[in-house]
Amino acid sequence: MSAQVEQLEFQAEARQLLDLMVHSVYSNKDAFLRELISNASDALDKLRLEAFRNKDLDPRTVDTSDLHIEIEVDKNTRILTVRDNGIGMTRAEVVDLIGTLAKSGTAKLRQKLHAAKNLKDTAASEGLIGQFGIGFYSSFMVANKVELLTRKAGETAATRWSSDGEATYTIESVDEAPQGTSVTLHLKPEDFEDELHDYTSEWKIRELVKKYSDFIAWPIRMEVERRAPATSDGEGADGEEQVTIETQTINSMKALWTKSKDEVSEDEYKEFYKHIAHAWDDPLEVIAMKAEGTFEYQALLFIPSHAPFDLFNSDAKIGMQLYVKRVFIMSDCDQLMPMYLRFVKGVVDAEDMSLNVSREILQQNRQINAIRRRLTKKVLSAIKDLQAERPQDYRTFWTQFGKVLKEGLMSDSDNRDTLLHISSFASTHSDEEPTTLAQYVERMKDGQDQIFYATGESRQQVMNSPHLEAFKAKGYEVLLLTDPVDEVWVGMAPEFDGKPLKSVARGEVDLESEEEKTAHEAERKEQEQNFAGLVNWLKETLSDHVKEVRLSTRLTESPACLITDAFGITPALARIYRASGQDVPFGKRILELNPNHPLITGLQQAHENGGDDTHLRQLSETAELLYGTALLAEGGALENPAKFAGLLADLLSRSM
C-alpha cells in the first residue's frame, strides 16, 4: 500500500529549461535510450562496487546474483520500460535527482542553450545537456509521461516519481518494489516529420542498443517474439504461425579497451566516449594503450573536441574511470591524471590491484603513480602528434584547452619542456595565427638571444602598451600572453631551447647593437646630464608611488611608462596572489621617461626655470598626472581616480 501522493511544482526556471531542452536541443531523439541505459549501467556498477567493499550486506535485501538491464515494451499501450536491478535510490536521492534539474536550471545554462540554438550549433547544445547531467529528462522528448520506480539496495521502502514534463510532478513512498530502478515511458505517437520512431519495435530497440550501448559491460535483455511455421503434427492449424517468447541479450558486452585499435570502428569509439564522458561531441583524438611488465594495465583515453562548461570550476572532476580486471572501481579518479589534463576522459583497467582500493589508498599507491606518469606522457605525445600531423585539429584543441594545459607549466616540472613545445601563443608576428616557441626561435633576429613577451588582459591592451614601442620600432617579435595563468608560469619556465624568456615590462631593455651603442653614447650621456635635475625631482615628488625614475630605452612614442624590477612582482601577479589569499605587500615600481617626448622636454624646461609656489604646485600636479597616465597606458587601475580626474580638470581649465 502506498503512502499519500505528494504533488509538487517545478520551479519556473526549471520548467523553462525543461521545455527548451525537450523542444529545442536534441537533434536526435533516439538518444534518450542511451541516456537511460547509461544511468542503469552506472547503477549496476555502484552496486557491484558496494558488494565488493561491504561483505556484510544482507542477502535478503541486497541481490547481486544476476545484475542486468532489462528493456520491456508493450506495443498495445505504447509503453517502454528500462529496468535495472542495481543500487537504486532512496526517496531523498530521488528528490535530489529532481533538484538536479532545478539546480541546473540556471540563467547561465539557459543562456548557453539559447545561444547554441540561435547559432544552430547542435553539437554545442547537446554537449551542454550531457555536461549538466540532466540527460534523464530527454525521455520527455519521446514520452507524454515518465514514471520512475526505485528501491535502494538494502532498504525496504521504495519511491515512485511521475511527471508529464509540464508544471508538476508527483512523488510517493511505496511499500514494495524490486531492487533497483525502472523508468517507464508512455510514448508519444509516431511522427515521421518530428523523428519520433516506433520505440516499441524490436528491430528499432536492437538498432539503438547496437549503435549506442553495445559495449555496456552488463547484459541488456529483452523479451522477443519468435515465429515458426505450422508443424505437420497438427499444431498451428489453418497455417497459423507458432509464436514463442524468449529472452535475449541484445548487446555484446565487450569492453572496448581490451580490443586492439584495428578491431574497433570509429563509430564504436565515438559512442563509448559519449557514454563514459556523458558528452555529445565526438572525440578529437582516441588513445589506446596496453602496458605489460611490472604494472600491467590497459587504457582507452579520449581528448574531447569541446571544453566542458565546468572546466575552470574549483571542483572540476577528472573524468577517468578505474577498473580492476574489468570490475568497475570508481569514476572521477583524480589520481590517474594531473589536474591540468582534467579534460581527458577515459578508462584504465589494472590487472594487479585490490578490488577494495579506496581514494585514500590510491594517493599512496606506487602502481597508480606509475600509471599516472605514463598516461600523462602518452597524452602529451598525442597532442604533439596533433600539432605536427593535424594542424587544424591541434588548433581546435588549443582553442578549447590551451588555457588549462598551460597550468602544467606551473605544476609539472618533469614535463615542462614537452609542454613548452606543444603550447601556442599569440604574437606580434601575426594577427590571426598563433606561434609555437620553436617557430618564434626560428624567426629571431640576428644577435637576439632572448624570447620577448608581454602580459595583459587582452591582445588590444598589450599591443597598445608603451612597453612594446621600441620592440615594434626595431622589428622584434613579442609573444602576447593574455591568460591569467601566463603571469604565473613565465616565472617558472625561465627558458626555452637555451633562450631566456624576457618580459618587455621588466628590468632594463637593450635592443641596440654594439655599433648603435657607440653611435648613441655621447647623446645618451648628454641626456642624462640634462635630465638629471628632473629625474631627481620626480623621484622625490612621486616617492609614494615609485622607487626610481630613469630615462628609457624602450619608449619611442609615449612620454613615460612603469616597469617592474627584473625579479619583482608585477601588479597583475600580485592581484592573482591576493585573490588566492596570499598576503603580497605593495611594491613600488620604476618610472621611465622618454627624453625625446615634448611633454618630458617641456617638463624638464619648466622644472629648470623654477617659479613661485603656485608654479611648483602645478608642476607637482603634472608629475602626478604623468604617473597616472603611465599607469592607465599599461591597462592598470588608478589608485585614486577622483584625485586624478580633479587634477586633469584643473589642467584643462588652465589651458582654456
Swiss-Prot record:
Location of region: C: 576-656
Start and end residues of each stretch annotated as B: 360-575
NCBIfam families: PRK05218.1
Gene that encodes the chain: htpG
Pfam annotation, one family: HSP90
Region called A, residue ranges: 1-359
CC annotations in GO: cytoplasm
Job description of the protein: Molecular chaperone. Has ATPase activity.
Entry's Gene Ontology molecular function annotations: ATP binding; ATP hydrolysis activity; ATP-dependent protein folding chaperone; unfolded protein binding
Protein name: Chaperone protein HtpG
Localization (cell): Cytoplasm
Keyword field: ATP-binding, Chaperone, Cytoplasm, Nucleotide-binding, Stress response
Keyword Cytoplasm: yes
Oligomeric and partner information: Homodimer.
Record-linked PANTHER family: HEAT SHOCK PROTEIN 90 FAMILY MEMBER
Family affiliation: Belongs to the heat shock protein 90 family.
Domain of life: Bacteria
Originating species: Mycobacterium leprae (strain TN)
